[in-house]
Amino acid sequence: MRVLAALSGGVDSAVAAARAVDAGHDVVGVHMALSRTRAQHRTGSRGCCSIEDASDARRAADVLGIPFYVWDLSEEFTDTVVADFLSEYAAGRTPNPCVRCNEHIKFSALLDRGLALGFDAVATGHYARIERGAAGVPELHRAADAAKDQSYVLAVMGPERLARSLFPLGEVPTKDAVRAEAAARGLSVSAKPDSYDICFVADGDTQGFLRSHLGSQPGPVLDTDGREVGAHDGAYAFTVGQRKGLRLPRPAADGRPRYVVDVRTASNTVVVGPAELLSVRDVLGERPVWLAEEPHEWTDATVQVRAHGAALPARIRTVTDDDGASHLAARLAEPLRGLAAGQSVVAYDGTRVLGQATVAATGRDAVAAAPALAGVGSTA
């Protein structure tokens, strides 16, 4: 099988490519250039596309004895991932750019280009497993290493893309085992640190990145009774559940901490309140992607709402709005704090991914949009 190995310049993708070679595939390495920003190209940059990353990817390919290319996908990346990140924050939502990158770049632009060139699949260093179910249909499962599992950010792929993907690290027990294997193979990236920053925010300052693109937009901070208790430089910079950075001039009358409970970008207003207002049980997700049969009746499952969050017991089903659009509805067994629109909600049956959607509404707003939720118990 002809396999295109995505080489980021890190240890995971290098070992994944090595394992693809070991499996007997005809492997070609490719490094994706995703930015034309000088700050991200500089040596030592923590974002994507640094000179060091490209050089490390090339050295890994040399050690493995595979051809290596750099593909410029910066236009696609900017027009989809970065643009979505900015527009979502501008709309008062909290996006996950890694999900969008997997959806639009790694398993879309990269995969499509590879297929057009005669490749059969793309191999990446993601921690997840693909198993074959009934009639050979691919299933996405959690990785053996629960601490590194990335099925949450891969659930957006869809079954057709999943069938063209390889995750050679899915069964590896620990990241230490990956590093040891890299060292044994003579890969220079064996001790290279992991990257946890948003890749296109080179200095790690997300708020500064947003300000530089969206500008200063002064507005009021209100309490839940509508009283002005502070000011901000842009509602887009806040997310539900946030406490840090509010800079309120005086404490609440009851002395309790205040958190962001709503972001109203139409009026450029941030609303703050006590922690208990953050607890919700109902979630409505839009644009669902299913990797299993859609549940048209209430079904027991677990859901995950953050990249490294816990698996939360819930009941899920699909619902249809007045316009005929399908949604994923979920009722959590226990209330959850700080869930914001724009985040991804992923449903699981054990280790298997059932489906994914983008959070559109929570709590009573979710019930108002999906009345079916009202029949599953009390609403938080």
Curated annotation (Swiss-Prot):
<keyword id="KW-0963">Cytoplasm</keyword>
<keyword id="KW-0819">tRNA processing</keyword>
<keyword id="KW-1015">Disulfide bond</keyword>
<feature type="binding site">
    <location>
        <begin position="6"/>
        <end position="13"/>
    </location>
    <ligand>
        <name>ATP</name>
    </ligand>
</feature>
<dbReference type="GO" id="GO:0002143">
    <property type="term" value="P:tRNA wobble position uridine thiolation"/>
</dbReference>
<dbReference type="InterPro" id="IPR046885">
    <property type="entry name" value="MnmA-like_C"/>
</dbReference>
<feature type="region of interest" description="Interaction with tRNA">
    <location>
        <begin position="148"/>
        <end position="150"/>
    </location>
</feature>
<dbReference type="Pfam" id="PF20258">
    <property type="entry name" value="tRNA_Me_trans_C"/>
</dbReference>
<dbReference type="InterPro" id="IPR004506">
    <property type="entry name" value="MnmA-like"/>
</dbReference>
<comment type="similarity">
    <text>Belongs to the MnmA/TRMU family.</text>
</comment>
<dbReference type="GO" id="GO:0103016">
    <property type="term" value="F:tRNA-uridine 2-sulfurtransferase activity"/>
</dbReference>
<feature type="binding site">
    <location>
        <position position="32"/>
    </location>
    <ligand>
        <name>ATP</name>
    </ligand>
</feature>
<feature type="disulfide bond" description="Alternate">
    <location>
        <begin position="101"/>
        <end position="199"/>
    </location>
</feature>
<dbReference type="GO" id="GO:0000049">
    <property type="term" value="F:tRNA binding"/>
</dbReference>
<dbReference type="GO" id="GO:0005524">
    <property type="term" value="F:ATP binding"/>
</dbReference>
<dbReference type="InterPro" id="IPR023382">
    <property type="entry name" value="MnmA-like_central_sf"/>
</dbReference>
<keyword id="KW-0547">Nucleotide-binding</keyword>
<feature type="binding site">
    <location>
        <position position="125"/>
    </location>
    <ligand>
        <name>ATP</name>
    </ligand>
</feature>
<feature type="site" description="Interaction with tRNA">
    <location>
        <position position="343"/>
    </location>
</feature>
<dbReference type="InterPro" id="IPR046884">
    <property type="entry name" value="MnmA-like_central"/>
</dbReference>
<feature type="active site" description="Nucleophile">
    <location>
        <position position="101"/>
    </location>
</feature>
<feature type="active site" description="Cysteine persulfide intermediate">
    <location>
        <position position="199"/>
    </location>
</feature>
<keyword id="KW-0808">Transferase</keyword>
<protein>
    <recommendedName>
        <fullName>tRNA-specific 2-thiouridylase MnmA</fullName>
        <ecNumber>2.8.1.13</ecNumber>
    </recommendedName>
</protein>
<comment type="function">
    <text>Catalyzes the 2-thiolation of uridine at the wobble position (U34) of tRNA, leading to the formation of s(2)U34.</text>
</comment>
<dbReference type="Pfam" id="PF20259">
    <property type="entry name" value="tRNA_Me_trans_M"/>
</dbReference>
<feature type="site" description="Interaction with tRNA">
    <location>
        <position position="126"/>
    </location>
</feature>
<dbReference type="GO" id="GO:0005737">
    <property type="term" value="C:cytoplasm"/>
</dbReference>
<dbReference type="Pfam" id="PF03054">
    <property type="entry name" value="tRNA_Me_trans"/>
</dbReference>
<keyword id="KW-0694">RNA-binding</keyword>
<dbReference type="InterPro" id="IPR014729">
    <property type="entry name" value="Rossmann-like_a/b/a_fold"/>
</dbReference>
<keyword id="KW-0067">ATP-binding</keyword>
<keyword id="KW-0820">tRNA-binding</keyword>
